[in-house]
């Protein structure tokens, strides 16, 4: 639910993890 894509830990979100 965030406007800007933030680097998330692997596993949590693979889609946003690439950012």
From Swiss-Prot:
Subcellular location: Mitochondrion membrane
Listed GO CC annotations: mitochondrial membrane
Catalysed conversion reaction: N(6)-[(R)-lipoyl]-L-lysyl-[protein] + 2-oxoglutarate + H(+) = N(6)-[(R)-S(8)-succinyldihydrolipoyl]-L-lysyl-[protein] + CO2
Cofactor dependence: thiamine diphosphate; Mg(2+)
EC id: 1.2.4.2
Principal location class: mitochondrion
GO molecular function, one term: oxoglutarate dehydrogenase (succinyl-transferring) activity
Keywords associated with the record: Glycolysis, Membrane, Mitochondrion, Oxidoreductase, Thiamine pyrophosphate
Spans through the membrane: none
Gene Ontology biological process terms from the UniProt entry: generation of precursor metabolites and energy; glycolytic process
Function (record text): The 2-oxoglutarate dehydrogenase complex catalyzes the overall conversion of 2-oxoglutarate to succinyl-CoA and CO(2). It contains multiple copies of three enzymatic components: 2-oxoglutarate dehydrogenase (E1), dihydrolipoamide succinyltransferase (E2) and lipoamide dehydrogenase (E3).
Family note: Belongs to the alpha-ketoglutarate dehydrogenase family.
Record's subunit section: Homodimer. Component of the 2-oxoglutarate dehydrogenase complex.
Protein name according to UniProt: 2-oxoglutarate dehydrogenase, mitochondrial
Taxonomic lineage of the native organism: Eukaryota, Viridiplantae, Streptophyta, Embryophyta, Tracheophyta
């Amino acid at each position: 639910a965030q406007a800007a894509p933030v680097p998330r830990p692997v596993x949590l979100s693979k889609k946003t993890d690439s950012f």
